[in-house]
Amino acid sequence: MKSRRSMTVVLTVGTVLIGTAATADAATGRPVAVWEMNERAGARTMVDSGGRGLHGRIGREVGTDTYVSGATGYRFDRLEPDSPPPRPGHLVTVRDADALDPGTRDYAVTIRLRTTHKFGNLVQKGQATVSGGNFKLQIPGGIVECLFRGSVSSVLVSSPRRLNDGRWHTVRCARYREGITLSVDGTTVARSPGWTGRIANSWPVSIGGKTSCDQIDVGCDYYAGDLDYVQIDSE
């Protein structure tokens, strides 16, 4: 950054705020993890500067110490969608920890990204059918989507415009009891009401795609582009 039980799913789709200059919601609580992604070339450990020691493992295909447009971060090369075999070296993973689960707390994920592509999962913990729920940010068609799936419902919110324009964008998705908000570059662009309920699973945080996939029955949804940092905050 230089510059676990069965549930009934009710999906609530985000309501886009168009033509508003509303500023992003206030910061949610305190940092849980801060991954600045400033490691040297060839590094295999992503350092957490948030103080909890939630360091990550950098896959061998991830380009560290990548400088572009005033920022140093990680580069994820494009891989052909749904083409086996899976490429786990394309991912950065952080082992499961209670602090990384949203639980029932206010919880926010912030990511700074730059891409010209239109596909892939940015960051997630868990997958669609796992016990305990999951969350993820993804960028289908260049539109950033944020999903939180919990014990009560699933709530989805989407950016109103494409962000795959080759520029750096800071995206923040926050889950509150009232619903989910999405901000882009400091401005709230969408909200979706609804309480997700508790989210707590035993999966790692994965950056750049899925950890459990085969590219045949389950696509790995590998991200292509650059990331400057990822930060998680909670109450």
Regions found by a protein language model. Give the residues of each.
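Secretory targeting and sorting signals
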Residues: 1-26
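Extracytoplasmic low-complexity segments
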Residues: 5, 25-87, 190, 201, ...
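Extracellular glycan-recognition modules
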Residues: 29-32, 41-46, 82-145, 180, ...
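Short hydrophobic/aromatic patches on beta-strands that form ligand-binding or substrate-lining surfaces
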Residues: 35-36, 48, 107-115, 171-173, ...
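Acidic glycine-/aspartate-rich tracts in secreted/extracellular proteins
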Residues: 37-44, 51, 114-119, 128-130, ...
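Flexible glycan-contacting loops in extracellular carbohydrate-active proteins
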Residues: 71, 192-226
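Short, aromatic/His-centered strand-loop micro-motif at the edge of beta-sheets
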Residues: 146-170, 217
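Localized edge beta-strand/strand-to-loop motifs within extracellular or lumenal beta-rich domains
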Residues: 167-181
